[in-house]
Amino acid sequence: MKANLCYRAGAVLAVMLLTAVFAAAADNGDGIFVLTSTNSASNNDVVVFKLNTAGTPTLSLVNMLPTGGAGGASGNAGAVQFGDDFGAVANFGSNSVSQLVRQGGSISVAGTIKLAPGCVKPASVALAGNQLFVVGANCAESHKFPSGNVDGPVVALTDPSAAQIAVGQSWAAVTMTSGSVLQLLLNGEGTLNGTTAKVTLPSAANNTPLGAAFWGDILGFNPAHSPDSFALVNKNRNVFPVVGPQPPYPTNAPCWLAKGPGSLWYSGNSPGQAISIFFSDGQGGTFYKSVSLPGTPTDITVSRDRQWLAVIYTAADGSGGRVAVFAIDAYGDLSPVATSSPIGVAAFSGVAFSQ
């Protein structure tokens, strides 16, 4: 009987927490949007979904916006980002970034930002303050945003395998699928200052670095094909590896990373078809559990208010690219909220919230 009462109390608490999340979201009259891209090698489109939390939650297609550029990237994350009113999407095949703008309850493509001369194939973008950061096949660069002008030195890259760029307080990081992480220092105004250093990775955490995210000035990243498939790096380039879900690659490979509330991190585990959850402090952490998905995740994000998680995945039933949204409760646990219907796109690239 006591166990029954505990179960009922827990269920009531879970419902109350989920209801509170929905109520907080409903306070935003303009709504919550989830953006991704088709990544088409001929004509890239931004795909805009709206999350409706009234009654039975839904994730409905609102618009498909031609970027005016071409996609075609693979093995990357962070192709789409969104801040307060402006966002960006990488056009890998046309050496450009499209600027997005939100006005009330609508999102549109506002223009094209060209890469610095000689820089090609942008794979990942990041937004921090009034800066846009871009990494491609041969350059990492920062631009004033939303104006788009190159701001600060362009960093030449000799390794064309960049997967993602992420930005902290005093430094940015680029993960390289070839097996390295590059530190890019920032100046006092938050732009790249041209100084770079390679992070020395331990042998148990150096195979195929992919997803990356910052917690203040601490980098978290996924060396996806390593036994230690999650790791932290501080500004002094000290590395703190964390054992991932077992068995390791090829059964499990946390690939794509998002920072959650508190000490939580969420990772898209592609072969495991799951979201793998980690806890950490600043010098280590632990794998907690995995939440199953009906397909292979290809990128993941958490909303700025830390109440929602969105993951893009390629459905196991062959229906193509899908977006799933989860509510994050007060303890960091995930509750499924809504999933998009198939729209005829084989796989999505990049995912971001606009609130």
Please give the residue ranges for each predicted region:
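Bacterial N-terminal signal peptides
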Residues: 10-20
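Beta-rich, blade/repeat-based domains predominating
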Residues: 27, 68-83, 115-131, 156-171, ...
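Conserved beta-strand positions in repeat-built beta-propeller and related beta-rich domains
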Residues: 29-40, 89-93, 134-138, 168-169, ...
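Structural motif
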Residues: 43-47, 96-98, 141, 180-183, ...
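Short loop/turn segments immediately following beta-strands, especially the blade-tip
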Residues: 49-57, 100-106, 144-150, 183-192, ...
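A short beta-strand motif characteristic of beta-propeller blades
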Residues: 60-71, 108-116, 151-157, 193-203, ...
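Aromatic- and glycine-enriched pocket-lining scaffold segments that form the walls
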Residues: 133-189, 195-204
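Blade-level signature of beta-propeller repeat domains, shared across WD40, Kelch, NHL, RCC1
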Residues: 321-355
